């Protein structure tokens, strides 16, 4: 309020400067120093607004205490956007990933450790736990979330494979399609939907790409050697045949360079002062370990567009747009063969490309997952080292850190146990930390000022976003924070139960995405 008084909006104050100005809303109270009284009516705050204010701060909602109003607002709006469902249009510029979130947590840590390093570590651990809940568990329908992207990729691959099988059933006498299916049948029948991101299956499909393209198309841009159907059969039986080299191809071939994807939007290279920088020395370049797909009959313009989309957000935007429009994920030109073979080749090329994307995205997920686990464990050990004396709580936290390291229980169970002992941990901080009432009252004062004067206040991007979101929630124009997602009661909690959550929301499980997830 002091900055508001010193700005061009000084007219919203009335009377002389007072040493202390206090505003009360039932049991909520906030005091400002060295400003006049505001020209507002406290009675305009309803009981419903007071109730909603409990969901508008990190201190009251997540028990992250000691934060300045600006830092509290930044972390609150990041978690709000992570927890709420994003079913609208996807924009990679608005995506909140691990790097962005951890940078804000690190800034909070640096700001708060001057007051209490123990409290800063506790808040950091809480922030990691809530990120895990919102990003690694409740990812369904959240565009821009890597797990949701992988989930959608697997379903698209499954749909294309179903279309391949249906096309085969409709053309029982087509020799080329029959030969194509004979090659792929052994691959498809041994894998399930949650394994389309597995590098073993991708390498199996990759090895068949040129063979399949030769069978279905056989044009000069595909064939480096001309094989007749009879010669191919002889080659399979080990009979050598003399072949002629093909002429140069007319249509361009898309071949994504190995290691092409270095994406700022999903990269995990960032700075982590005092939180374990040794983790990130070799963590960034996890992409490029797979052989890149070679796809035929893609125009030069489409090649440039695909490469641009891969650089921007690893094809997320284009993928979601094509999926919603029911188009192919990548456009394939007509190869000039029969209609049935052409459709089969387009489907196969899209399967290969989507599997490539899925395998690469999984590598990023695995790297981020390992980083999250290590950061969690490091924070627990740091909390133990900062707590003075010997106590039962220190032993409990040491056990939780040990459980993470040796995979004795899931990260969700560890976080749930940490929340249970959190009140006892906060007793070691050494000063009262529950300042949520003052922050809630401050938000209500901001609402009254904005409702009457609507001042344009220059803020940091996320501080302004938090202010706008909070005011819209108080006015009833925005969905409140989904409190049910934070309910850790055994009777209602689905998010910490792998089988229950994935069965209820019909999404793929972590069993293969993250190795030993059940034991994490």
Curated annotation (Swiss-Prot):
Species: Elephantid herpesvirus 1 (isolate Asian elephant/Berlin/Kiba/1998)
Family per similarity comment: Belongs to the herpesviridae U4 family.
Name assigned to this protein: Protein U4
């Amino acid at each position: 309020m002091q900055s508001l008084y010193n700005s061009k909006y000084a007219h919203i104050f009335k009377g002389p400067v007072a040493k202390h100005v206090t505003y009360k809303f039932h049991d909520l109270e906030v005091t400002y120093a060295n400003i006049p009284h505001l020209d507002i009516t406290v009675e305009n705050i309803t009981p419903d607004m007071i109730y909603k204010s409990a969901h508008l701060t990190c201190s009251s909602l997540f028990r992250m205490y000691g934060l300045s109003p600006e830092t509290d607002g930044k972390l609150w709006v990041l978690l709000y956007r992570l927890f709420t469902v994003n079913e609208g249009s996807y924009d990679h510029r608005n995506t909140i990933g691990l790097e962005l979130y951890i940078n804000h947590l690190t800034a909070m840590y640096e700001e708060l450790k001057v007051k209490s390093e123990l409290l800063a570590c506790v808040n950091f651990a809480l922030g990691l736990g809530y990120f895990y809940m919102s990003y690694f568990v409740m990812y369904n329908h959240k565009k821009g979330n890597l797990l949701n992207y992988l989930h959608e990729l697997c379903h698209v691959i499954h749909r294309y494979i179903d279309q391949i099988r249906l096309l085969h059933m409709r053309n029982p006498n087509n020799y080329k399609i029959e030969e194509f299916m004979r090659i792929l049948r052994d691959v498809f029948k041994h894998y399930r939907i949650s394994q389309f991101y597995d590098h073993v299956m991708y390498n199996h499909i990759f090895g068949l790409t040129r063979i399949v393209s030769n069978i279905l198309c056989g044009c000069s841009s595909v064939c480096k050697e001309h094989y007749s159907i009879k010669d191919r059969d002889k080659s399979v039986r080990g009979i050598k045949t003399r072949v002629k080299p093909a002429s140069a191809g007319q249509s361009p071939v898309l071949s994504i360079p190995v290691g092409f994807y270095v994406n700022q939007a999903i990269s995990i290279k960032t700075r982590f002062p005092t939180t374990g920088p040794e983790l990130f020395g070799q963590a960034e370049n996890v992409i490029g370990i797979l052989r890149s797909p070679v796809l035929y009959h893609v125009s030069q313009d489409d090649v440039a567009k695909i490469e641009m989309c891969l650089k921007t957000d690893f094809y997320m935007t284009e993928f979601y747009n094509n999926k919603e429009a029911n188009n192919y994920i990548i456009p394939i030109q007509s190869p000039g063969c029969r209609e049935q073979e052409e459709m089969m080749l387009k489907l196969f090329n899209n399967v290969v490309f989507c599997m490539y994307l899925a395998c690469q995205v999984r590598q990023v997920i695995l790297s981020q997952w390992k980083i999250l686990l290590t950061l969690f464990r490091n924070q627990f050990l740091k909390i133990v080292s900062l707590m003075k004396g010997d106590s039962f709580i220190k032993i409990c936290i040491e056990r939780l850190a040990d459980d993470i390291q040796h995979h004795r229980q899931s990260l969700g169970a560890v976080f749930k146990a940490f929340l249970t002992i959190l009140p006892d941990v906060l007793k070691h901080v050494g000063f009262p930390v529950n300042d949520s009432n003052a922050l809630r009252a401050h938000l209500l004062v901001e609402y009254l000022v904005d409702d009457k004067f609507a001042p344009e206040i220059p803020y940091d991007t996320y501080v302004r976003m938090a202010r706008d979101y909070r005011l819209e929630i108080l006015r009833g124009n925005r969905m409140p924070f989904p409190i049910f997602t934070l309910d850790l009661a055994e009777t209602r909690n689905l998010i910490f139960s792998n089988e229950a959550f994935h069965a209820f929301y019909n999404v793929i499980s972590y069993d293969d995405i993250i190795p030993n997830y059940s034991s994490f």
